[in-house]
Design a protein with these regions (language model features):
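Secreted/periplasmic carbohydrate-active enzymes, especially glycoside hydrolases
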Residues: 1-340, 352, 381, 396-397, ...
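Substrate-binding/catalytic cleft of secreted carbohydrate-active enzymes
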Residues: 337-570, 578
């Protein structure tokens, strides 16, 4: 599958598969020029799986902060063409060498990067090597759920080092389309298309074709007067059934994920020198009157927390079908979206969310501590995340901070509060089309959604604890004033401003069906008890007149966490239809 479905070219070479591999525990690879020495690599690894995973073929959990990759390839490119090398993600810092020449450095374990390697190619066979540096004990690195200790424990999982998303090559012309941004203007029924060329070339023209279910809707041709080109396309064209006035029309929703196809051709002197295909959806998200609106209609989100880990691949899905399977299983249980938790997911997952209709709250891995390094690293990664994923209609919310991770003193420290506010405004400055949550869970500053975590429902026999949990959720006033954690809902100096309130982590009922040691926030022993407890917890949510959505913890078991609705290998613990029946009990009219 092409790694970037919203930027799809025909002429590309997949570099996934077997690479030579080496650990560099003594940090001698640079000095000894391992980038030029195939003999320095004693192991073989299957890219894009990290060495800690079973599917890599190595399957070692011991920490190695520096690892090297090496492989050869051939590529056919004419004199007038360029060869661009792409990396989906390398955790954490990557130095890339081609034929013994250092071609780029990239920091950021969850974001993509590319480099033009044309000037470093030689006749015949090419050699590429990658040095990945991931100091596992550095707590200022945004690593999310990857544990900085040797063994996973609690809510922390196995570390991932090195290449964990696809690697590929593209052969392009001297001038080519480098970026495309697709912005829906829902109220106007139009779409804005912005493109950036790698360089300005006079006499270049951009030809576009936008279609809906193979019906041509808009077409035209622009003359380039700079490297940037921009145009608006009238998509609804004042047709009432294209808007969502009656039903969903041509809009994108989880229930009706309608998509537009776009084809772009870059033309010079009558010759097509670049061609790509993409897609987008007409989707709007905003808040008003204490509610979340999807396409200007009140919409209640029923989300599932999704860690994006697999037993054989860790952060990397075993196959593209596994992304699709997770979404279909979640929808089968009655969920309309997910919080992709502490991970920036592969674009192939977002593609399936777009295609199948599944809301996504996008996150970035968090550092453990607050310092100048962590601030700079987060700002850089978020810039790259939004640049890559902006055009996906499924993403409706950005979550830059979770549970004060990376800002442990935010409740009272003005400096860390400034950072939270800065991230809120920074993401809005980069993306005006989505909601932003300042600190999901508690100690919020400025935020579009009041996102609260509460696991205090207790065991079934703890009736007093459950009654307190239920009463806490019952009204907006109680949700803000009755604490479920040692931290306040809003940080010192900030207060509730009538935002929609969502319960964005709760549940976590532990149910072990595999015999492995593990934990949940509460526990049950069999399927009947699980469904009763799930009903009990969701009944408290449904009794609330203050909540405008929820996110249940969680989709699957992950390592020592056995609180998923599915096992780690995606087997249902209970009848999925029974889960859906409980999720379907709620209707929007129940909220004040």
């Amino acid at each position: 599958e092409y790694p970037r479905p919203q930027f799809q070219r025909e002429n590309w070479l997949n570099l996934n598969g077997e690479w030579h591999f080496a650990f560099d525990d003594k940090n001698v690879g640079l000095k000894e020029k391992w980038d030029q020495e195939e003999e320095a690599y004693p192991h073989r690894i299957k890219v894009p799986f990290v060495y800690q995973s079973e599917l890599s073929g190595i399957n070692q959990r011991e920490p190695h902060d520096i690892v090297w990759y090496y492989r050869t390839f051939t590529v056919q490119a004419m004199d007038s063409q360029r060869v661009v090398l792409h990396f989906g993600a390398v955790d954490y810092e990557a130095d890339v060498f081609v034929n013994g020449c250092h071609v780029t450095n990239h920091q950021g374990g969850h974001t993509s990067f590319e480099v033009d390697i044309t000037d470093y190619l030689v006749d015949g066979q090419q050699a590429i090597s990658v040095r990945a540096f991931d100091p596992h004990a550095d707590e200022s690195i945004p690593r999310g759920k990857q544990f900085w200790e040797t063994e996973s424990a609690g809510i922390w999982y196995t570390n991932s080092t090195g290449i964990w998303q696809p690697v590929w090559l593209e052969v392009v012309s001297e001038t080519y389309l480098k970026e495309i941004t697709l912005t829906p203007n829902f109220n106007e029924g139009t779409g804005t298309v912005e493109t950036i060329l790698n360089q300005f070339q006079p006499q270049c023209e951009l030809d576009y074709r936008i279609s809906f279910k193979e019906q041509l809707i808009a077409a035209g041709r622009l003359s380039a007067d700079s490297a940037k080109m921009k145009f608006n396309a009238d998509l609804f064209q004042e047709h009432i059934f294209r808007s969502n006035f009656h039903h969903d029309g041509w809009s994108w929703t989880p229930e009706n994920p309608q998509l537009f196809d776009i084809k772009l051709s870059l033309i010079n002197d009558g010759e097509t020198i670049d061609y790509l295909k993409s897609y987008f959806g007409m989707r709007k998200i905003h808040t008003e009157n204490g509610m979340v609106y999807l396409n200007n209609k009140p919409y209640y989100q029923k989300l599932i927390l999704d860690q994006g880990y697999w037993p054989s691949g860790l952060l990397t899905a075993p196959s593209d079908e596994d992304f699709k399977k997770d979404i279909l299983l979640a929808k089968e249980m009655g969920f309309n979206g997910c919080r992709k938790h502490q991970k920036t997911e592969d674009p192939r997952f977002l593609y399936w969310a777009d295609q199948l209709g599944f809301l996504v709250w996008g996150e970035c891995a968090a550092p453990a501590i607050y310092n100048e390094d962590s601030v700079e690293r987060l700002m850089r990664e978020w810039t790259e995340i939004i640049a890559r994923d902006f055009s996906h209609p499924s993403i409706v919310t950005w979550v830059p901070i979770n549970e004060s991770w990376g800002v442990p003193k935010i409740s009272f420290d003005r400096t860390q509060q400034h950072f939270s506010q800065a991230m809120y405004h920074f993401l809005h400055a980069l993306d005006k089309t989505r909601l932003v949550i300042s600190n999901d869970g508690w100690a919020m500053t400025e935020t579009d959604i009041c996102a609260i975590h509460n696991y205090a429902h207790g065991q079934k026999e703890e009736t007093e604890k459950y009654d307190y949990f239920k009463e806490t959720l019952r009204t907006r006033e109680n949700l803000i004033k009755r604490l479920s954690t040692p931290w306040p809902i809003f940080a010192n100096g900030f207060s509730y401003q009538e935002q929609p309130i969502l319960l964005t982590e709760f549940g976590g009922i532990g149910f072990d069906v595999s015999g492995q040691p593990g934990w949940g926030y509460t526990s049950v022993d069999n399927e009947v008890e699980f469904l009763k407890d799930y009903q009990r917890v969701l009944s408290a949510v449904y009794a609330s007149v203050g909540l405008w959505g929820y996110c249940y913890t969680q989709l699957t078991d992950v390592e020592q966490e056995i609180n998923g609705l599915l096992t780690y290998d995606r087997q249902p613990k209970v009848d999925l239809a029974a889960i859906k029946a409980i999720n379907d009990q709620f209707h929007v009219s129940q909220v004040e």
